[in-house]
Amino acid sequence: MQINISNLDVKNHLDKFIEDRLEYEFCKQDKYLYLENDNLKLHYNNKELFIDFNDSEILNRINPKTKKCSVVQAIEGRSKAKLTILDTTAGLGRDTFTLAARGHTLLTLEKDSYLYLLLKDALQRAQQINYLKEIANRITLINTDSNEYILTTDKSFDCVYVDPMFPPRKKSAKVKQGMQILHQVGFNDEVSNSNLLDNIIQTQISSKAVVKRPINAEFLSNKKPSSQLKGKTNRFDIYSL
């Protein structure tokens, strides 16, 4: 696998935390990683993506005084136990970090190598912050395809979370820049997403799966959930397996 990096300084920075198997090709292009003030960023189609778990939005989500967000309600249900959760689609890592802040242990998968490196860098920075270190340490991040992982692992989990990263709404101007890039870079096709739910059920990797969907979307893989948690623009389909 090759990842194009814009300069040697970035390569030296990445070498601290990525596997030796990755090779780099240095060239100018529309999609590349670069280092700015010791922060790893992605340049893509004249847009910029930077992941920071110490920003105000994340800090508000994980504040104990803040009402539990929908993904937490859907995954925890009425349980007060600390869960082991497989997050099959890391994306920007916000849901993963929010769940880890609740005391849960996360194994988080991201198949896109660019997003993986951004997340890895963000987690390492969070590990250097006293009030975020414990949260970040509950997250294990792996650069792999979710379907492949589920079909080959011998691990089991209390819950599997699937966020297919559906395309942005028609009013794309209202979608934040980071989400615009995420939809373009990390979007999975519907067949892959349907296979993911099928594989979760087939392998019996967990007794519960939670799938995030647009509010009016069809059920993933045409499988009716056991229950649902609905919001204004999206919903969480909950499967008891």
UniProtKB/Swiss-Prot annotation:
Q: Which UniProt keywords apply?
A: Cytoplasm, Methyltransferase, rRNA processing, S-adenosyl-L-methionine, Transferase
Residues bound to S-adenosyl-L-methionine? R94, D95, D163
Q: Which CDD domains match?
A: AdoMet_MTases (cd02440)
Where is the protein situated, by its record's location annotation?
Cytoplasm
The enzyme class is: transferase
**Catalytic reactions of this protein:** guanosine(1516) in 16S rRNA + S-adenosyl-L-methionine = N(2)-methylguanosine(1516) in 16S rRNA + S-adenosyl-L-homocysteine + H(+)
EC annotation? 2.1.1.242
Show the InterPro entries listed in the entry: 16SrRNA_methylTrfase_J (IPR007536), SAM-dependent_MTases_sf (IPR029063)
Give GO MF terms, alphabetically. rRNA (guanine-N2-)-methyltransferase activity
* Gene Ontology, cellular component aspect: cytoplasm
The UniProt family comment states: Belongs to the methyltransferase superfamily. RsmJ family.
Stated role: Specifically methylates the guanosine in position 1516 of 16S rRNA.
Q: What is this protein called?
A: Ribosomal RNA small subunit methyltransferase J
Q: State the species of origin.
A: Francisella tularensis subsp. novicida (strain U112)
